[in-house]
């Protein structure tokens, strides 16, 4: 999902103030954050459908968006995960706003209880024409994510920011990014992914997160809920 920082109905301010940023993934205002929503039962699926509809009908501004007011209204039956570096909590940690990150965790924990999880990701890469800085930022925020998760009694899950299925699909994905952003493949100063965003096997994920085994174990808990 993409979750807007302000109410969706405050669109005049959006036009003046917002800069573009780059499961079903929603956006909660263009200046907002990524958020992962999963339906764990029929009610959750119905609410997910309502959120999708509202994001297109009432929340569309450059892209479909929801806000926390709508999320609060249709939260029943949903599992929520904090998302990648584009999520609210990682963004606030990277901005050194730790108290605000803690406040955001408390908000989600209060609404979703044990159905809220904090994600950690690692996309170390040596592939050509890839973003090598993502892994550095991920590593920098993981200690704080683990600390805040423990403080708020929220479980941590190890995830991969999946954008394609197989490892060999990375080059095709890179070309699709160029098409969607209107840039040439040879341009250096364009959007790059890490080329690690494929659907990794349990064995691959274990090798990446074997130092944080509980984060791997907790992913199975989500499977058992659905």
Give the location of each predicted region.
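Phosphodiester-processing cores and adjacent nucleic acid-binding clamps
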Residues: 1-226
């Amino acid at each position: 999902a993409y979750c807007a920082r302000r109410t969706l109905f405050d669109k005049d301010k959006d036009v003046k103030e917002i800069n573009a940023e780059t499961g079903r993934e929603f956006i909660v205002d263009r200046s907002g954050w990524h958020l992962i929503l999963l339906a764990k039962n029929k009610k959750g699926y119905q609410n997910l459908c309502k959120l999708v509809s509202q994001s297109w009908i009432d929340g569309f501004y450059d892209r479909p968006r929801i806000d926390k007011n709508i999320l609060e209204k249709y939260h029943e039956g949903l599992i929520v995960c904090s998302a990648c570096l584009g999520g609210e909590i990682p963004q606030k940690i990277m901005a050194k706003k730790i108290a605000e990150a803690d406040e955001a965790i408390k908000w989600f924990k209060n609404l979703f209880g044990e159905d809220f999880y904090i994600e950690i990701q690692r996309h170390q890469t040596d592939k050509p024409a890839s973003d090598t800085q993502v892994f550095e930022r991920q590593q920098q925020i993981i200690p704080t994510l683990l600390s805040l998760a423990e403080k708020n009694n929220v479980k941590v899950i190890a995830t991969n920011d999946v954008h394609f299925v197989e490892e060999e699909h990375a080059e095709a994905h890179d070309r699709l990014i160029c098409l969607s952003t209107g840039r040439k493949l040879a341009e250096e100063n364009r959007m790059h992914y890490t080329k690690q965003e494929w659907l990794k096997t349990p064995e691959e994920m274990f090798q990446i997160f074997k130092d944080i085994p509980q984060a791997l174990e907790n992913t199975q808990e989500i499977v058992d809920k659905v």
